């Protein structure tokens, strides 16, 4: 009886950890998409070409 309870507890614990890890990864993917949003807040006079260059540079760096 106690061993069944321990196995059930362990199973629930592992499943909850896996779910938390998946949620964390999804949040990080969303954050990665917004990495260059701070450039808009800096009020820099970047041309669209310069902004595109920076975005491409970040994409190449991530690969």
From Swiss-Prot:
Claim: Heme is one of the keywords in the record: no
Q: Where in the cell is it found?
A: Secreted
Q: Which family does it belong to?
A: Belongs to the non-disulfide-bridged peptide (NDBP) superfamily. Long chain multifunctional peptide (group 2) family.
Q: One GO CC annotation, please?
A: extracellular region
> Does the record bear Signal in its keywords?
yes
Q: In which tissues is it expressed?
A: Expressed by the venom gland.
* Protein name as annotated: Anionic peptide NDBP7
Provide the alphabetized UniProt keywords.
Answer: Secreted, Signal
Signal peptide coordinates: 1-20
């Amino acid at each position: 009886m106690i061993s069944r309870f321990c196995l059930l507890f362990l199973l629930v614990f592992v499943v909850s950890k896996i779910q938390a890890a998946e949620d964390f990864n999804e949040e990080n993917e969303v954050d990665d998409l917004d990495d260059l949003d701070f450039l808009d807040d800096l009020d820099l006079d970047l041309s669209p070409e310069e902004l595109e260059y920076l975005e491409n540079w970040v994409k190449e760096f991530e690969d």
